[in-house]
């Protein structure tokens, strides 16, 4: 949540602007029932859609609508990331939003977007891949997966004619995240696999390794 200050020395019927500069909100996505056969992750292919939501509440005079202007941007980045493009995603509403040129983790508004009092603006974000996990994220302990994400907003907000003075509005950023599905992973796995010779069979392969997976066995022994 950030407070927008719409300042005007006299009552006006013109739009009044407020700047949003590097306003950061932190979110944690977690999953606590990951198979313990996965020891660590380098990357994970995922398939889930999260809604990035924007709404507002007023702390002083009545405001019925604010407008986030064309070019408003929202960056989504892993907390503490040291390599770029940790989050790979597509946008569900490409008519109104796009990926900012040269910044693969930044959503840019193609048009002005109104947020009316009591309503919520939703931006669907379809996540495809997560990679370059910072320390303490991904599989941070057996069976537990976590992402800590920074959402960083920049741009201009406006509101229609207001009385003289300082109009304060709280801009609220949030996310709606369903259950996260890890479709495939690159990393270290440590399943218990039984190998019987004559004929050669491999048994006890966990579900997540059964379909179209090639195994490189390092230092196998019988």
Locate the predicted segments by residue:
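Extracellular/secretory-pathway and virion-surface proteins
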Residues: 1-222
């Amino acid at each position: 949540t950030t407070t927008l200050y719409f300042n005007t020395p006299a009552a006006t019927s013109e739009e009044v602007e407020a700047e949003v500069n590097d306003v950061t909100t932190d979110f944690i996505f977690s999953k606590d029932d990951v198979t313990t056969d996965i020891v660590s992750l380098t990357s994970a292919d995922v398939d889930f859609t999260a809604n990035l939501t924007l709404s507002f509440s007023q702390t002083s005079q009545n405001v019925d609508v604010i407008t986030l202007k064309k070019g408003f941007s929202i960056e989504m980045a892993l907390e503490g990331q040291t390599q770029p493009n940790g989050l790979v995603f597509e946008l569900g509403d490409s008519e109104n939003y796009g990926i900012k040129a040269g910044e693969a983790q930044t959503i840019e508004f193609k048009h002005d977007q109104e947020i009316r009092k009591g309503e919520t603006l939703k931006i669907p974000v379809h996540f495809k891949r997560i990679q370059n996990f910072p320390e303490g994220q991904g599989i941070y302990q057996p069976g537990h997966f976590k992402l800590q994400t920074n959402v960083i907003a920049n741009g201009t907000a406006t509101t229609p004619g207001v009385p003289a003075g300082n109009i304060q509005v709280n801009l609220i950023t949030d996310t709606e995240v369903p259950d996260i599905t890890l479709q495939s992973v690159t990393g270290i796995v440590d399943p218990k696999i039984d190998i019987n010779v004559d004929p050669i069979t491999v048994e006890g392969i966990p579900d997540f390794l059964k379909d179209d997976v090639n195994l490189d066995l390092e230092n196998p022994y019988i």
